Amino acid sequence: MRPASLDEAAALLSAASAEGTAVRIGEDLSTAALDRVLEHEAGDLTCTVEAGIRLSALRAALAERGQRLSLDPPGDPTVGACLAARLSGPLSHRFGTPRDLVLGVTLVLGDGTIASAGGKVVKNVAGYDLGKLVCGSEGRLALIARVSLRLHPLPQASSTIVVETDNPAGVVRALRSSVLQPSALDVLVPGRVAVLFEGSPGAVAAQLDSARALVGGVEADDGVWEEARERQGRALGRLAFAPGDLGNVLSTLDEAVVRPAAGVAYVPRRVGGVPDAAARQIQRRLKERFDPAGILV
C-alpha cells in the first residue's frame, strides 16, 4: 500500500480494518508518496509537511528561506519515522528531540479515522498533545500522516572543538555549568568530548575562545559529527541514564556515543530491560484507545 493522499491512506486503513488485516506502517503501508511541504510560514518559524518527506528534501526546501529543522539523526529518514522512532542526533543537546519540535499532527487511526491535534504556531495549546504521544510509538498507535514543526534560523557560522581527556565527565560538567550555549555536546567513548557552537560569527568566536580557556581542546571539522551519527546508527542498544550518573555510566563503557543532556548512550551491544508494570499498563490502555482492533502491529 502506497497512498498518495490523506484520504487514500484513511481508505486503505479502513479497508484493512474491515477485513481484519494487520498492517505494519513502513512495511505494508509506505508513506513514500506523502512527501510534500504543505506550508512554510517563515515568519512564524513553522512548517507543515507530509510525514513521508525525507529530511534531506525538507532541509533543502527550508534552506531556501534561511531556516532549518534542527533534527540531525543518522541517515536520511522521513519526518514520520523521526517521530515514530524518536530519532534525533547531536543537535538534540540544544534543540531537543522530535517531541520538542512537533507542534501538531494529523493521524490516521487503525480504523481509518482521521484525527488532528495541536497547531501550526508555537503558542498553540488547544487539544490533546497527540504529537508528543506518538513520538516513540513505532507506528503501533496510528499512521502519522502530517506534521507541523518548529523551525530555527540557519546559523551564520559554526565551529567545533574536540577535547581529548581521561575525564570526559569532568569536561562535560564544566561546560554545562558554564554560561556557554553549545548546539551539540557529545562524548565519543573513549576519551573525546565534541562541542559545537553556532550563531553569528562574533558569538561563535567568543564562545569558542571561552570554551578552549575552560576545557582546552582543538578545532575540528564536521567529520566528528559524521562519526558520531555513524556510530549512533550502527549501535545495537540505547542506554538511558540520569544526568547525575554520567561518570558512572562512562566508566562502564568501552565504546559509545553519549549525549549527556538527553541522558542516553548509544552502545554497540543490545541492552536488556522490560518496561515496569505501570508503563506496560499505560501502553496497553493507549493501544486499546487508539487501535482497539489491533490492526497496527
Regions found by a protein language model. Give the residues of each.
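A short linear hydrophobic-aromatic micro-motif
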Residues: 22, 181-186, 254-258
